[in-house]
Structures are given as structure tokens and as C-alpha cells.
């Protein structure tokens, strides 16, 4: 039986918030980095996004779960977040697409959550103090004890979390039946020739694969630790470096592989973590943001052009390190003027810090997938 029981959120500095949970039959304590997302919609895509691995996500929008959960809007095959914080979680949801409620979904995967706290106050506190580790508990409500437990968990800086989310095997991806919300693309003529794309899986979202599939690409997904020679043996027309969690500078094997791939002059498109790893391979630097960029309304642009973008990252590429290289800054995050996109001045490499595949979020940057296609077509033409 699901009933409301007391729960507590404790931050590593001792700050705590008392609230409630609907997990009467599960006594759970979880620790992770407490972050916030400002999106009004898309909670299902957010909680299944592998980039949120090891994080407790605070939703700033006050009502979460109103439209339930369905099997079409997931971004991976499991819940990725460590915990969920909300002002209110709807116990009974309503949508013609729903298959279960958010509460049922979280309980099925044993993901702890807390609601009934002042999420506005929590978000403002994280903005002032920066993201930090925290704990959700509905078992032991002693905040001093929980603070000590938090101190035993490492911070995000220096953590390589990719092995927890990458595929263990290489596989070809071809989604036979696209979700109902892909109707426009389902009926669209595939005007592009079959281009072979290798996706290096640092924690790839499904909608990245869907976008490539609807543009006619042959997609092979490979583990993040795949040796360079195995990638090249597939004779790809292009390589996509996916999103993923953790500190990019700790992914030494990924940086090494990309460095070796750069010598082949094959088109490379990096998204989020892939953007950071590509820039690290090109000898740029990354750093941890104070509270990150997580939401679906982040303005990005350059030269009087603005895109509203979906973003989810706690690290960024250092601007000064980019300017010293043969790289061009193609986009800035216009909220804080951090690097949001780069391109190489002489080679077919480009990347963005945000998510052009959206899910959730606007489609302003969707053109980048078609740009990738055009670069690959040119590469194939020159190779022949």
C-alpha cells in the first residue's frame, strides 16, 4: 500500500529540508550530487537521461508527474537519476498516453524521492552555494548522521562515470517503429543516401539515435572503451560522440581514442560530454560550473543569432584554452557567456554543449544533424 511517510533531504554542509514520500514499503537512503532542472515539462525524459547518473534532481516547476509515464518518452531503458526532489508529485496522473504513474515508476525502480519542500528556496541556495552532495532518506531522519554519511561519498570532480552507463557490446541500432510523436519524420522521404555512423556511447540518449535513423543513417553503437582500430574497421562515414555523466577530464581512454581518430580526418560530431571530450582531445581544457546548466530554455548563439536549447551539464570547456587552438567558438551560452559550441577551422570536427535532439526541449538546433549529414556526404564524395 502506498501512503505518505516523512522523508528528509540533507545537504553536505548540514542544510536540510523535511518533506514527504510515497514509499511506505521501501526504506531507502540515497546519496548523490544535488542539482536542479528548470524545465516545466519533460520529467520522464530527464529522469531516464544517462547524463543524470549519480545525481539527485530537483525540479523547479512545482507540479511533477501530472501526465504519468509511458514507454515512448524514455531516453534509456532504465531510470538514471539517484533521487528526485519536487514541490509536489502527483499521485494520480491523467493522460491518454500514460501507462503508470510517476510514483509507481519510481517505486518500481526503487528510486527515492521527496516532495513537500520549498524547492524555490533549495534552488536559490544551490545557486548561491553551488551544487553539492546530498542525501534523501525516508528511513533514518537524523540529519547529523546523514551528513556524516554524505562525507563518505566522493564529489563529481574527477569521477569517471561512463562505465556505469555505456553499452557493454557493439550493436546496430534500427528502431522499427518510431514513437507516435515522430509522425512528421515517419512520413518524410529519406532523401539522404545510407551513411554509416559510429556512435561512441558515453551514455547516449535514444533520441540522438532516432534523429540519425530518420535521416537515413546506418547506426552502429559502440562501447566508450572501444579501441580505435575497431572503430576504423567499420569504415564509418562519420562518428558521433554522445552525451554522458561525470567529469570529462577523467575519461582518459575516451580522450585517447578521439585523439587517434582526429588523425583520420573523419567527420566527428560531439554532443554534451562528446563536445567536452572532443575539445579535450584537441588540447582544450574543461572546468566545473558552479551550479551547471540544466533546463530547456537556455539561449545559445553567436553574431546576433540565438537558439533556445535544451542543456544538461555540470562541466564546460574553458574559453581561453579554446582561443589558443585552431578552434572557432560557434556558440556561447548567452546566460553566462560560457562556450556552447566549437568547430575546427580546417577539419570536419564540430560539437555543441547542448542537446540538438531535445527530448525534452525545443528543436531550434535540430539542423545540426542535417549539417552532420552534409559533412559526411562531402567526406564520402572526396574519399571516392
From Swiss-Prot:
Gene Ontology molecular function, alphabetical: ATP binding; carbamoyl-phosphate synthase (glutamine-hydrolyzing) activity; glutaminase activity
UniProt main location, coarse: plastid
UniProt keyword terms in alphabetical order: Amino-acid biosynthesis, Arginine biosynthesis, ATP-binding, Chloroplast, Glutamine amidotransferase, Ligase, Nucleotide-binding, Plastid, Pyrimidine biosynthesis
Cellular compartments annotated: Plastid, Chloroplast
Matches recorded under InterPro entries: Anth_synth/Amidotransfase, CarbamoylP_synth_ssu, CarbamoylP_synth_ssu_N, CarbP_synth_ssu_N_sf, Class_I_gatase-like, CPSase_GATase1, GATASE
UniProt keyword Cytoplasm present: no
GO annotation (BP), single: 'de novo' pyrimidine nucleobase biosynthetic process
Chain residues that bind L-glutamine: 51, 244, 246, 273, 276, 312, 314-315
Enzyme nomenclature, EC number: 6.3.5.5
CDD domains for the chain: GATase1_CPSase (cd01744)
Known catalytic reactions: hydrogencarbonate + L-glutamine + 2 ATP + H2O = carbamoyl phosphate + L-glutamate + 2 ADP + phosphate + 2 H(+)
Role this protein plays: Small subunit of the glutamine-dependent carbamoyl phosphate synthetase (CPSase). CPSase catalyzes the formation of carbamoyl phosphate from the ammonia moiety of glutamine, carbonate, and phosphate donated by ATP, constituting the first step of 2 biosynthetic pathways, one leading to arginine and/or urea and the other to pyrimidine nucleotides. The small subunit (glutamine amidotransferase) binds and cleaves glutamine to supply the large subunit with the substrate ammonia.
Subunit structure and binding partners: Composed of two chains; the small (or glutamine) chain promotes the hydrolysis of glutamine to ammonia, which is used by the large (or ammonia) chain to synthesize carbamoyl phosphate. Tetramer of heterodimers (alpha,beta)4.
Protein name: Carbamoyl phosphate synthase small chain
